[in-house]
Amino acid sequence: DGEQALQASLSVKEKLQIALCLEKIGVDIMEIGFPISSPGDFKSVQIISKNIKNSRICSLARCVEKDIDAAGEAMSASNSFRIHIFLATSTLHMEYKLKKNFHEIIDMAIFAVKRALRYTDDIEFSCEDASRTTIDNLCRIVEKLIYHGVKTINIPDTVGYTVPNELSYIIKNLLERVPNIHKSIISVHCHDDLGMAVGNSISAIQAGARQIEGTINGIGERAGNTALEEVIMAIKVREDILGVSTNINYKEIYHTSKIISRICNMPIPPNKAIVGSNAFSHSSGIHQDGVLKNRKNYEIIDPSSIGFKKLKLNLTSRSGRAAVKYYMSEMGYKDTDYNIDELYADFLKLADKKGQVFDYDLESLAFISKHPEELEHFCLKFFSVQSISNGLSTASIKLLCGQKLYIESSTTSNGPVDAIYQALNKITNFPIILQKFQLIAKGKGKDALGQVNILIEYKKRKFHGIGLATDFIESSAKAMVNVLNNIWQAEQVNKKLQELKK
């Protein structure tokens, strides 16, 4: 279901990689494709079926004979699999989409179940748009489906219309009014159109549902599906009131989220619950102080429990002395090595001007007593880039290093930005590794600015750089020069500390 959100279909290799990640994280059942939809999807289901051993695989099918046959044949290499059949049951869908009455819908559903039982005894049936289906009709079709062998009854909130107490009401009615409901598991499949997919899923658990369908990062059609990692951690953290558990390997959550984000080319919003970059970061001085004293003060989840290990305190003008001292301590400095009052005063001035401050900025303030802007050693005076049709790019630059001007050029097949970076490196000769490159549009139209953020590793330490210009190549060059100045600044601090030790 998550693939419906993507602008382009995933390759077989990418789908297999995701399936292996889901197996490693410990999902009970994974829906690996819709085999009838395309030859490529049929092939991917075949290949995944041969490689997944610890999770049960499942394929989707309409109540159409060829769909069901394709699903069964595609998964035939697996020893244990499920066929998931779906059919709309709401009056709206029956009348305007299917042009059928409810009696015909029941007949179609029963036919499909009987066909699927030729391949496996594990059948799941989704009453599409169940949340807008009359409760009488829903109870009636569910009873007949279970009678004919369906083991999992899925109740989808197909358009994300339901609120938690409504879905809870539906589940409770099924448990109370369907006499053979004990022979099946009730599942829910929620969409996030009103932002309630996770809340609805939790409400369904409390009402008696025992299978939750979702996707990692909530990827899905329109506003997305239930974010699986959010439901998982809600169950873990609030087991006291939910009274259920999962077989999930929690430490794989963060890693799995990042891999799927990368494969699907769908960035994770910073404020995304559980896996967002800000999920365990703290900017307020009061919060930072509280977290440093005891992380439970402001963190209900131990970040390491999901594979996110490092405590992240953002150094901004809202940060207090505790955060500054924490960063200095992390870099190996004792309280007696610097004056916290002077450092904090200088830090606030820099934070007001710069926005976010980094560890190497603190070092400069503490031991050189100058703002980083005053320590700019490198200044890009000129650059020119030429790219030709054979893929080669040549960059020529003039870089002022202190009082001396250097001229350098570089040719590469990796594009104009790489050509500039190589030319800069020839002059500065810092052994750096580019770890992250991000381009962000600032504004719209021809006057829009491109902001480039880069992250560099130098001598096992991270350095950040930002560049802003109307041309992204110029932004990229400025970002690298910014990084080089930060590295040079850190080197000056090291020299100063070595002198103090003599």
Swiss-Prot record:
Domain Pyruvate carboxyltransferase: 1-254
EC class of the enzyme, as a word: transferase
UniProt xrefs under InterPro entries: 2-IPM_HCS-like, 2-isopropylmalate_synth_dimer, AIPM/Hcit_synth_CS, Aldolase_TIM, LeuA/HCS_post-cat, LeuA_allosteric_dom_sf, LeuA_bact_synth, PYR_CT
Major location category of this protein: cytoplasm
Protein EC: 2.3.3.13
Region annotation (Regulatory domain) ranges: 379-502
Taxonomy, superkingdom: Bacteria
Positions with a binding annotation for Mn(2+): 1, 189, 191, 225
Cofactor(s) essential for the protein: Mn(2+)
Catalytic activity line of the entry: 3-methyl-2-oxobutanoate + acetyl-CoA + H2O = (2S)-2-isopropylmalate + CoA + H(+)
Disulfide bond annotation, renumbered to this chain: none
Compartments where located: Cytoplasm
Any one of the GO BP annotations: L-leucine biosynthetic process
Keywords of the record: Amino-acid biosynthesis, Branched-chain amino acid biosynthesis, Cytoplasm, Leucine biosynthesis, Manganese, Metal-binding, Plasmid, Transferase
A GO molecular-function descriptor: metal ion binding
GO cellular component, one term: cytosol
Subunit structure: Homodimer.
Role, per record: Catalyzes the condensation of the acetyl group of acetyl-CoA with 3-methyl-2-oxobutanoate (2-ketoisovalerate) to form 3-carboxy-3-hydroxy-4-methylpentanoate (2-isopropylmalate).
Family (UniProt): Belongs to the alpha-IPM synthase/homocitrate synthase family. LeuA type 1 subfamily.
PANTHER family, A to Z: 2-ISOPROPYLMALATE SYNTHASE 1, CHLOROPLASTIC-RELATED, HOMOCITRATE SYNTHASE-RELATED
Protein name per UniProt: 2-isopropylmalate synthase
Organism encoding this protein: Buchnera aphidicola subsp. Macrosiphoniella ludovicianae
